[in-house]
């Protein structure tokens, strides 16, 4: 008989994988047709608030996931992590769909993502053997890539480092691994996925630094 906790987390895992596969297609289709709807109603206040509210909800889940893992409550940790991850599939999409993108949302969305992942990794490092090394590699990669993006943005080359297929696959395996590990569904499988995610993190990070070589070269060639 399947445990209810396993059923819940399995369904959430399938939703995360489906989001990773389908959301890019939805986004591309939306960009293809967004200019065709020239006559649309102005967004309501509710529509303006919803995307940022979802992002704020994800931020609010961060201490709950951490506390649940520290208090040995895997069911709460798994469910809260799954819910927080699913909101990531909708806040950005709804903001684009309703054309209510904001600077605050653009800032908070990646912050919420990274806080959720890093905090969960820290909590798992203290309670799950074997997590420390891949967690350290993933966190180091995130710090390096964040610094790279800031460097490129300061030089007016924000689009010089674009997320590719390896980065999206890294995110999908990372979220799946953390979901399995927080719920303690299959520790060996979860640890294996986390190691794969760490390898993809290093590989995709190296690709981003390779993309940014022209920015570094232009900076070196600049006078003064």
Language model segments and positions:
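N-terminal chloroplast transit peptides
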Residues: 2-28
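A feature for the membrane-embedded catalytic helix bundles of lipid/isoprenoid biosynthetic enzymes
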Residues: 21, 25-29, 33, 39-49, ...
């Amino acid at each position: 008989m399947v445990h209810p906790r396993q059923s819940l987390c399995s369904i959430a895992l399938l939703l995360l994988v489906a989001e990773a596969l389908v959301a890019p297609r939805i986004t591309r289709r939306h960009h293809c047709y967004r200019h065709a709807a020239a006559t649309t109603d102005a967004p309501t206040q509710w529509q303006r608030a919803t995307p940022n509210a979802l992002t704020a909800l994800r931020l609010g889940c961060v201490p709950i996931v951490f506390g649940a893992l520290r208090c040995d409550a895997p069911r709460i940790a798994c469910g809260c992590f799954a819910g927080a991850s699913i909101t990531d599939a909708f806040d950005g999409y709804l903001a684009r769909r309703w054309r209510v993108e904001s600077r605050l949302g653009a800032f908070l969305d990646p912050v919420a993502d990274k806080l959720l992942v890093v905090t969960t990794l820290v909590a798992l490092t203290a309670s799950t053997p074997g997590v420390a090394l891949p967690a350290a590699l993933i966190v180091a990669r995130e710090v390096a890539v964040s610094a790279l993006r800031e460097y490129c943005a300061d030089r007016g080359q924000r689009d010089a480092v674009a997320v590719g297929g390896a980065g999206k696959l890294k995110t999908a395996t990372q979220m799946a691994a953390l979901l399995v590990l927080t719920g303690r569904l299959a520790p060996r499988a979860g640890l294996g996925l986390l190691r794969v995610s760490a390898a993809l993190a290093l590989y995709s990070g190296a690709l981003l630094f390779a993309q940014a070589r022209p920015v570094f070269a232009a900076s070196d060639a600049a006078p003064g």
